[in-house]
Design a protein with these regions (language model features):
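Acidic ATP/Mg2+-coordinating residue in the GHKL
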Residues: 81
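Bergerat-fold GHKL ATPase/HATPase_c domain
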Residues: 1-64, 68-71, 89-96
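Glycine-rich G1-box
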Residues: 84-85
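Short beta-strand element(s) in the Bergerat
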Residues: 74-77, 165
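GHKL-type ATPase core
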Residues: 106-212
């Protein structure tokens, strides 16, 4: 972080920048509606990389995450990991606070800004969080209330032998194609490739032979030269375009 050091002599008065309580809903609205230009991509990218990071944290990076697409009977997109899950305190801390992140102390995971876990709010006003942790399955509803600040409510608890976290987001029928296209493109080079449920189109795209050629590749990052896209640097399953033409 960059800070500015100034001489204190001559200062007559000072005040810290802050956000008034009455303006918090307005600021949250800006973060929800203007942070992401491609909302389907933001949702797929943020929650899939979070799920992968959960596997890294649990010591199972080779295990695929699961991505389940909407059907006639189930209208939601579900992204599921099999990591440690989150306690109630962790759910409330991570999901209800912009800027809160569990990843700032490591270089082994993607993201540290504390924004991605709330990315569903750029598309919907509510989504479910299902945590399997310490023998308990807890279902939470994250939603934007009348204050526009948002809340998280615990809906149910029951015993479970499973671990991990699932994010459940209802997708509008007219947007399903956009989410399929984004998933096909983003998850194409995800490693390990996710288990995709309920959508043969995405499954078929992911099963095509990978045409990727690597300029540099190691266990931390890869520099990719791919006929389908520009040169990219891939870190933690996220590609960042760059130009090496010069």
């Amino acid at each position: 972080e960059n800070t500015v050091q100034i001489q204190s002599s001559g200062i007559q008065s000072e005040a810290y920048f802050t956000i008034k309580e009455s303006n918090v809903g307005h600021i949250f609205g800006i973060l929800r509606n203007q942070l992401y230009s491609n909302k389907p991509l933001a949702i797929i990218r943020e929650y899939c990389t979070n799920a992968f990071d959960a596997h890294v944290d649990a010591g199972i990076p080779e295990r695929p995450i699961e991505v389940s697409f909407p059907t006639h009977f189930k209208k939601s997109l579900t992204i599921r990991d099999f990591g440690k899950g989150l306690s109630e305190n962790e759910v409330f801390t991570v999901f209800n606070s912009y800027g809160e992140s569990t990843k700032r102390g490591t270089n082994d995971q993607v993201g540290m800004l504390g924004l991605g876990s709330k990315s569903a709010f750029c598309y919907v006003n509510d989504f479910k969080i299902v945590s399997h942790h310490d023998g308990v399955k807890s279902v939470y509803l994250a939603y934007i209330d009348e204050s526009n600040k948002g809340k998280i409510s615990l809906l149910s608890r029951e015993a479970t032998d499973e671990t991990g976290l699932a994010i459940d987001i209802v997708i509008k029928s007219e947007d399903l194609y956009s989410f399929r296209e984004v998933a096909s493109q983003f998850l194409y080079e995800f490693n390990p490739q996710p288990i995709v449920l309920n959508d043969d189109n995405v499954v078929n795209n992911l099963s095509k032979q990978d045409q990727t050629s690597y300029i540099v590749r190691n266990d931390k990052y890869a520099v990719v030269n791919d006929s389908r896209k520009s040169n990219t640097v891939r870190m933690g399953n996220v590609n960042y375009d760059f130009d090496i033409s010069d």
